[in-house]
Amino acid sequence: MGDDAERNERELRELRLEVDEQRRDISESDDRERRQDTLITRLRDEAAVHDHDAAALRNRLEAAEHELVDLRAIRDALTPPELPQRPGLDLAAAFLPAVAEQVSGDFYLGAEGPQDSTVLVVGDVVGHGLNAARRAAFARTAFAATAPFSDDPCRLLSWANTALIERAGITSEFVTAGCVTYLPDERLLRWAYAGHPRALWLDNGQELVAPTQGTALGIGPDLGLTESSQRSVAGAGVLLYSDGLTEARGADRRFGIGGVRAALGGLSWPSPAEAVAILRARVADFAYGALTDDLCLLAARSR
């Protein structure tokens, strides 16, 4: 009996030890499972964050791509590759952006007016980027839509001003514009400005002066416009431009009207295409290829 009791006691101790060991194994397994669950939860959280970040990046990339498409479409609309053929006039134009692939508010227009007249406009919206480009596109469309109904530059500028204010209200995002019209049967040039640099005679760089410079479009109903006109001789030429031309910066000064006159003065009776080409080259050299503002040129010469 004593031996059986000892054996039973020993087996009981061994069984207890085995149970304790199993309990420890179970406890360690539970700890491992808890750690594994914690790790899985953390990894899932991190994956969710990464997925959110990746989705946000994809959305930003898609938005940037859509904006680039819009910018290019608007740029092509503001600066079409070809100008229309107009009675009695040769035309040429150019647009030089300050930053590659960026569209500013500069635009030009050569359009048909009444009685075979031609309407020429160069405009500049304050600012850069998509908002300025859209405002410029709207302004250009307003001029293009009204050009067939008048060869009066003051009236055309006023109509564009009304359209801008009706669309967006009075705003600080103003538009400057110069408008020149040409009636070939009378060889009559008419011009007016809404806060825009004066046009220049193509052969000597002198300004086409108006009694007043007018107020920029979009900032109020009263532009204070006045028109000037002149009967031109055959071959007379004019240049409209945005202020990116004269305000281009060199090493220690701006290109200025003096730079424009010097460039044109080196040519003898230049065609519009020649005048635009020499001005593009000269101002790019002057600014070392780094324009600080976009630049728009529109030249015309009567036949």
Where are these regions (language model features)?
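Activation on terminal intrinsically disordered regulatory regions flanking enzyme cores
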Residues: M1-D3, N8-E11, L15-E18, Q22, ...
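Intrinsic-disorder/low-complexity, polar/charged segments
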Residues: G2-D4, D151-D152, P270-S271, A290
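Long, heptad-repeat coiled-coil alpha-helices used as oligomerization/scaffolding rods
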Residues: A5-N8, L15, V19-Q22, I26-S29, ...
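Acidic/proline-rich low-complexity IDRs
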Residues: E11-E14, R42, L156, L188, ...
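… and, occasionally, acidic/histidine-rich disordered N-termini of signaling adaptors
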Residues: E46, H52-G237, G289-R303
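C-terminal catalytic subdomain
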Residues: L157, S228, S232-L240, L245-R303
